[in-house]
């Protein structure tokens, strides 16, 4: 009996020695963690001036040393119905959910891949064809190399794919046209390479669409179900989902985006194009029409609190509280600078040179990493200063500046707030 008791105690001690309890976020005043509150407060007035000038909304959260030191919302989650300004616009709150756009790539797809790599279920040097049957060079391809493409090539954006084949727009996509997920994978397989893999770097949504399909192949689950049940739910995240309107959320909880669907104020047309103000549906055309709202490159919605937890997971080296998703070696592997482009890790944007100043500013450490999203979102994670910043916005919720000249430039995109680095620098400049 004594031996059994001693053995039990030793086993319990042994197991507890290997148990990891990661830091969790708490709130603190800016002064408690090294900020000058008066300097930081100046940002408040500047952002409000941007809202007054026409920027729809900004949600900002700042983490320092495991503490949330600033969380605030400015502006309106919805101020337009079509071209009409609402008499009673809906104010943004700190609980407002936003379309993350390409931050989906990091906080859905990369998080899933980092978890699967840590668990030994995938290796970044594996061939893409291992997980996607039929992914190979076609007889008529002018540029070949799909047969030898590895997952790491996709993550580094050196795989040869074009930036945006516009699959849902038949006028542009031609034979690659697809408005259903079942055919989209086949169209991706048929998409010609634009350059010899490894010869240059082109940031491509196609890369992350492929990665989404790979995750689904490994897990035998839809991408949204996998990340929502194995990552977000264990972390206690309640506002991070794909297709929020199908999962119990209502439009007033979500920031609206483009005023006239995907038409850029009436200059773009293709079959089934949305024309009403987008509110609770992913803005990205490939994600919505070609992938049913769930894709590896876009489609995720979240709020600043949930994003803060996900950024803290990265700062913690892979976990939060008693939840471990991956380890610090995996974090280092994915955030290490690419040999092809110092501003990329494995998917993550890295503060590798001065070209990243508009994103990370001039004061963040060179080890800072994160991502941006076309709808007006930024995440910045600085392991040197143990600091993270998330900016969520709905930049396309304003008129197009000049639809016939450039349909992708919105009036709000011409304002200084559209350059995240300035906001980031004001935050760093407030450190004592």
Curated annotation (Swiss-Prot):
Main location: membrane
Natural source organism: Salmonella paratyphi B (strain ATCC BAA-1250 / SPB7)
UniProt-listed HAMAP family: S12_YfeW
Entry's localization field: Cell inner membrane
Protein's UniProt name: Putative D-alanyl-D-alanine carboxypeptidase
Membrane topology: Single-pass membrane protein
Lineage of the species this protein comes from: Bacteria, Pseudomonadati, Pseudomonadota, Gammaproteobacteria, Enterobacterales
Family: Belongs to the peptidase S12 family. YfeW subfamily.
One Gene Ontology cellular component: plasma membrane
